[in-house]
Amino acid sequence: MPSVFTVRALLLDMDGTLVDSGAVVERCWSRFAHRHGLEPAAVLAVVHGRQGHATMAELLPDRPMAENYAENAVMLAEETADLDGVVPVPGAPAFLASLAGLPHALVTSASDGLARARMEASALPLPPVMVTAERVGASKPDPEGFLKGAAELGFAPAECLVFEDAEVGVAAARAGGMPVVGVGPRAAAYGPDALAATLLDVTVTAGPEGLLTVTVG
């Protein structure tokens, strides 16, 4: 049975939800792992969905945060320049096209420059509101980014539907009191309110009084 949500706005994660940047992430973070004597698989298991400095703090708990921020800045520059293999996830172009003129925001752990580069490389339009890493004080799973996105669109958190593929992103939506749709096969393990195998399984219909009907499945 399809899941149906009636909301006023959508809050969208980027990497893994709209954009497939997995090849770049694997290249950059595998180099990080080798630099620090870590197993690449162990690093890649925790990197997804959060800001780089937060991942480094988890992997290198004894290292000063200043060093994490410095290395993260270098890696962000590397990732922004490396767009080889960055493509839209299935259904993303049509999904975003269906949102034209409707309230929606991008809420990503990527920097503004990285987000714009990956969206452009994927030929995807930028949402009217973007909440990027520079605009929050805490990375997902903290709900700050989603709460900021809801506020900037002018809606209460419970009136917004989140789309996420990562465990920390689903947790952030939950912490913010927002319903959440998991996107992609691995999202099922994180307990979203509904699961879309791809964005091809999602339809958004604008109704009266600014209400959006979102059907998943």
Model-derived features with residue positions:
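N-terminal helical cap/lid subdomain that shapes the substrate entry/recognition surface
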Residues: 3-94, 100, 111-113, 124
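Hydrophobic residues in well-ordered beta-strands that form the structural core
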Residues: 20, 106-108, 182
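N-terminal-biased segments
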Residues: 103-107, 121
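A generic structural signal for short
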Residues: 17-18, 84, 104, 134-135, ...
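Asp-based, Mg2+/Mn2+-dependent phosphohydrolase catalytic module
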Residues: 1-8, 111-217
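Glycine-centered short loops/turns at secondary-structure junctions
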Residues: 101-103, 177
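Residue-level marker of regulatory loop/turn positions in helix-turn-helix DNA-binding domains and
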Residues: 88, 107, 138
